[in-house]
């Protein structure tokens, strides 16, 4: 169960749960591939949790021009 960031906080950053899952999944894959972390400190040790923390911080957003999401 995810306690931080809360689902309510995350949904303030994206328009739907589907978009949130797709965004977090894509960012987690980027972290798996060695992309640099965007925050100085994370609560989570797992890449999916780190991706969600980046979303709630506003560092990861949906690009409306990208077709993969």
Swiss-Prot record:
SUPFAM superfamilies linked to this entry: RPB6/omega subunit-like
Keyword Transferase among record annotations: yes
Family: Belongs to the RNA polymerase subunit omega family.
GO cellular component: DNA-directed RNA polymerase complex
UniProt-recorded Gene Ontology molecular function terms: DNA binding; DNA-directed RNA polymerase activity
Catalytic activity from the UniProt record: RNA(n) + a ribonucleoside 5'-triphosphate = RNA(n+1) + diphosphate
PANTHER family: DNA-DIRECTED RNA POLYMERASE SUBUNIT OMEGA
Signal peptide start-end: none
Protein name: DNA-directed RNA polymerase subunit omega
EC numbers on record: 2.7.7.6
Disulfide bonds: none
Pfam families in UniProt: RNA_pol_Rpb6
Entries under HAMAP family matching the protein: RNApol_bact_RpoZ
Summary of subunit composition and partner proteins: The RNAP catalytic core consists of 2 alpha, 1 beta, 1 beta' and 1 omega subunit. When a sigma factor is associated with the core the holoenzyme is formed, which can initiate transcription.
Keywords for this protein: DNA-directed RNA polymerase, Nucleotidyltransferase, Transcription, Transferase
Taxonomic source organism: Pediococcus pentosaceus (strain ATCC 25745 / CCUG 21536 / LMG 10740 / 183-1w)
Record-linked SMART domains: RNA_pol_Rpb6
Example of a GO biological process term: DNA-templated transcription
Function: Promotes RNA polymerase assembly. Latches the N- and C-terminal regions of the beta' subunit thereby facilitating its interaction with the beta and alpha subunits.
Enzymatic class: transferase
InterPro entries: DNA-dir_RNA_pol_omega, Pol_omega/Rpo6/RPB6, RPB6/omega-like_sf
